[in-house]
């Protein structure tokens, strides 16, 4: 995301993100966004989606999500109940208008044509695929045709994961242990 924003002479500071999923990838997005001055204001699970206008930016909220998904990974409603946020049952957050970036981070083929049309109509500029192939081919082609949007496909976005795997192999062979900051520095 940062590289896409940099290419567009933009920054992550103050950006509002909508994501699907709150597993390892989604939770990592929430944490990294908060560290960089952005915030996840919408996140979806199998039971619906949560709208937290303040964002998932505190350790309390991030830790609660870890606990919540460990107890019951199929329901994100407990987050809304605990923090007094809006919960929309049985729906996805694709199409909400008060975000800057959409990031599907849950599962393959999560975003189909109907959702892609809602995303495009929302006026959002950035669509960043984080899960492996989260968008159906027809929906991805449709989004890429939108002149107002920057679309980053999963194969490009996830290249860092392959790089980190290589770094892990190097660490293991040399019996080293790098901090998250050191891994980030190695990637850049």
Please report, for each region that a protein language model flagged, where it lies by residue.
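Glycine-rich phosphate/diphosphate-binding loop of Rossmann-like nucleotide-binding domains
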Residues: 1-98
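Structural motif
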Residues: 16, 39-42, 100-101, 125-127, ...
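Short glycine/serine/threonine-rich phosphate/pyrophosphate-binding segments
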Residues: 25-29, 110-114, 135-137, 159-162
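Short amphipathic alpha-helical segments and helix-helix/interface helices
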Residues: 30, 76, 115-119, 139-143
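General beta-strand structural signal in soluble alpha/beta enzymes
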Residues: 42-45, 87-89, 103-104, 128-130, ...
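Rossmann-fold NAD(P) dinucleotide-binding segment
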Residues: 87-101, 109-126
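Adenosine-phosphate binding glycine-rich loop
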Residues: 120-188
């Amino acid at each position: 995301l940062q590289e896409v924003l940099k290419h567009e002479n933009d920054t992550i500071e103050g950006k509002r993100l909508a994501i699907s999923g709150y597993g390892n990838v989604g939770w990592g997005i929430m944490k990294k966004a908060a560290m960089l001055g952005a915030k996840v204001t919408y996140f979806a699970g199998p039971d619906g989606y949560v709208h937290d206008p303040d964002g998932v930016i505190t350790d309390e909220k991030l830790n609660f999500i870890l606990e919540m998904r460990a107890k019951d990974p199929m329901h994100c409603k407990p987050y809304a109940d605990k923090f007094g946020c809006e919960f929309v049952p049985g729906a996805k957050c694709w199409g909400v208008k008060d975000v800057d970036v959409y990031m599907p981070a849950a599962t393959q083929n999560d975003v189909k044509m109907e959702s892609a049309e809602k995303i495009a109509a929302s006026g959002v500029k950035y669509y960043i695929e984080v899960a492996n192939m989260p968008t159906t081919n027809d929906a991805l082609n449709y989004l890429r045709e939108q002149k107002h949007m920057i679309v980053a496909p999963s194969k490009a976005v996830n290249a860092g994961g392959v790089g980190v795997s290589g770094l892990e192999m190097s660490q293991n062979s040399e019996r080293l242990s790098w901090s998250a900051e050191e891994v980030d520095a190695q990637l850049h």
